[in-house]
Amino acid sequence: MTAVDPTRTEPVIVPPESAVPVVSPAGERHVDADEARRVAEAARETQWRKPSFGKELFLGRFRLDLVHPHPRPDDAARARGEEFLGRLREFCRTRIDNAVIERDARIPDDVITGLKALGAFGMKIDTEYGGVGLTQVYYNKALMLVGSVNPAIGALLSAHQSIGVPQPIKMFGTPEQKREYLPRCARTDISAFLLTEPDVGSDPARLATTAVPTEDGKAYLLDGVKLWTTNGVVADLLVVMARVPASEGHRGGITAFVVESSSPGITVERRNAFMGLRGLENGVTRLHQVRVPVQNRIGKEGQGLKIALTTLNTGRLSLPAVCAGAAKWSLKIAREWSTAREQWGR
């Protein structure tokens, strides 16, 4: 099987042994320290004017007033959150078998279907778009609950709506994009976030994936390889960061796009395996001449890195909840084992 089959309308999954080397078709991008620093600084959030508890603490000032008293949700938000947590708790108790996921290294299809029907993929999406509309507090509680049963499911849900299509569309999308994608993400579609590349991790200035405008100005052609694409193996929608070359009429720079995973030219080259999170659908995705309409661009050309970092900052609010849930589950197992084990006659 060839690595890329442009005639296919579904993502091609190539076994690891037949996957081509993970090398960007655009070639490795070399930048010096000054350019790397300039790109990172240009993406810094400049509109945020509120004081930061963490920053103040770093500077030696303990600003308790910034975190206490902690804001509480209103009665309607609390009722909505508690009702959803009750349904999610029952689903986790009756429908999720952690041992099966660990054994098979995948989340069963019926579990994913059930989570969609429950609304778990739309927890952070507003009700006007078909989502549950949870506050961040109740969203974290839900992820903690799921993480205490199976962390891979927590990562699936978190990657989908904390950094996948819903978050950047909510923050930077047009009204048309919100109407198009948020209802899909709330109920039917799984999304993934594609930023990291084989040679590009914390140094975005070296981003090699390109998005070349077509001559008619109606689309971009994307080429590149993305690594560590959580949900990328099963995703229906992708958020892809790619570099638009500067040219007449195009500012250029790192730009964000919503891409249909069924687009010709997309290849899932392999599914990565992990010691933990065995059910995680994380892979390597190659894009070869993938045509993306102009209306699928999020924001303006050159705003992609700021969109990506802002999205990731929001996503970092959810990961600790999944970790706390997993730690809670581990403590439960240790406690149960400590009371069941006999040693030295006790």
Task: List each language-model region with its residue ranges.
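Short Gly/Pro-enriched turn/cap motifs at secondary-structure boundaries
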Residues: 199-202, 228-231, 247-248, 274-281
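A structural signal for short hydrophobic beta-strand segments in well-ordered beta-sheet cores
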Residues: 209-212
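A short core secondary-structure module
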Residues: 218-219, 223-268
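A short, Trp-centered hydrophobic/proline-enriched beta-strand micro-motif
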Residues: 187-195
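Extended, charge-enriched "interface" segments that sit outside catalytic cores
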Residues: 2-98, 105-106, 110
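Glycine-rich beta->alpha junctions and the first turn(s) of the following alpha-helix
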Residues: 267-346
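Short beta-alpha junctions and helix-cap segments that line functional grooves
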Residues: 181, 196, 206-207, 225-227, ...
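Internal helix-loop-helix
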Residues: 117-188, 230-237
